[in-house]
Amino acid sequence: MLDDFFTRALIGGVGVALVAGPIGCFIIWRRLAYFGDTLSHSALLGIALALLLEINITLTVFLISVLVSFLLLLLQRRATLSSDALLGILAHSTLALGLVVLAFLTWVRVDLMGFLFGDILAVTAYDLATIWGGGIIALAVLSFIWNSLFAITVNYDLATAEGIKPEIINMIFTVIVAAVIAVSMKLVGVLLITALLIMPAATARRFSTSPEWMAVIAAVVGSISVLMGLNGSLEWDTPAGPSIVVAALLCFIVSLLPFPNLIKMKTRGFTRIANLPVKVKENDEAS
């Protein structure tokens, strides 16, 4: 019989993994790993401001992440620095500002390690409602913009010529990423959120034969990583958040073995066979 805290942690972790997987695919396709790091680092500033103003932490982290992402878009248009340089400036500036603000909160007892590396075992029923409610909304919006976002990812100019508005789609995607970071912050902490976005998607890439399958497999791999990580944390008394990331790393290492390519070849073979029956049956009837 599982303890209540473990069950809540598992339900919350799976909820985050189901959303982080598909979003992580676009982060990999668009090479936005450092962008994810920037938003996750800015989450600490959101936490500090929420504690200072005594308001909801999740909502504040979400708003700060959106603000930082829009600030990045603005700086990219006006500044002469490269995107990597701007991301580095924003990531480390917001992280440093967050730590400085927390240092001034002498009247508040702050669990800094919990914010940095997660405290999934302290997930409450309210957290579960936030994770699953926000996750469902994020997936619904992502499915709505999937084709447009994928078209922009593949060929920006062609997508623009077809009437798609890349700026609007990119802003919507940025808001989705910010929402995922806000709800998953308690799972693995602000320093490891990007790992939960990238590793399952990178693992799924080795097994998938289409973008949609990659998103599905990434969600499954993320869920498996959560289950493995929590079990390992319970068995060896290790931090839950880092344990989940280590489990995701093990899944990625397994994906580097040769058999994922064999699975992809077999899947393609089954797909080709499935496309043949009409002609084969006609030949059989004629004979």
Sequence positions of predicted segments:
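Hydrophobic alpha-helical transmembrane segments
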Residues: 10-15, 58-63, 88-89, 128-133, ...
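Short loop segments and helix-boundary regions at transmembrane helix junctions
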Residues: 25-108, 204-216, 233-236
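Helix-loop-helix "hairpin" substructures at the membrane interface of multi-pass membrane proteins
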Residues: 128-197
